From Swiss-Prot:
Residues 1-5 form a propeptide. The lineage of its organism: Bacteria, Bacillati, Bacillota, Bacilli, Bacillales. The transformation pili are flexible filaments, consisting mainly of the major pilin ComGC and smaller amounts of the minor pilins, including at least ComGD, ComGF and ComGG. Homodimer. Forms higher-order multimers. Interacts with ComGG; the interaction is probably direct. It is a single-pass membrane protein. The chain crosses the membrane at residues 6-26. The keyword Transport applies. This is Competence protein ComGC. Belongs to the ComGC family. It is found in: Cell membrane; Cell surface; Fimbrium. It comes from Bacillus subtilis (strain 168).
Length: 98
């Protein structure tokens, strides 16, 4: 009988190799996801800072609150980072709420 196919041992070896590859790649994906969320939050902070500066230029140096930026159309919605933390303006500085 000359049947073509894989033996159980060959299948187990392939599954073992796939398992090892998954164990190597999953932590890297998680690490990159955290980095992406951090960079996204930094980008949002920089955007709000730029909009604050534009508001100050348009309103004779008046320091805006986040509500001012939203009501005037500088920021369209609540500033929330990809990780769920909110952007706040305190004392004229843009910060991430902890």
């Amino acid at each position: 009988m000359n049947e073509k196919g894989f033996t159980l041992v060959e299948m187990l070896i392939v599954l073992f190799i796939i398992s090892i590859l998954l164990l190597i790649t999953i932590p890297n994906v998680t690490k990159h996801n955290q980095t992406i969320q951090k960079k996204g939050c930094e980008g949002l902070q920089n955007m709000v800072k730029a909009q604050m500066t534009a508001f100050e230029l348009d309103h004779e140096g008046q320091t805006p609150s986040l509500a001012d930026l939203q009501s005037e159309g500088y920021v369209k919605k609540d500033a929330v980072c990809p990780n769920g933390k909110r952007i706040i303006i305190t004392g004229g500085e843009v910060k991430v709420e902890h």
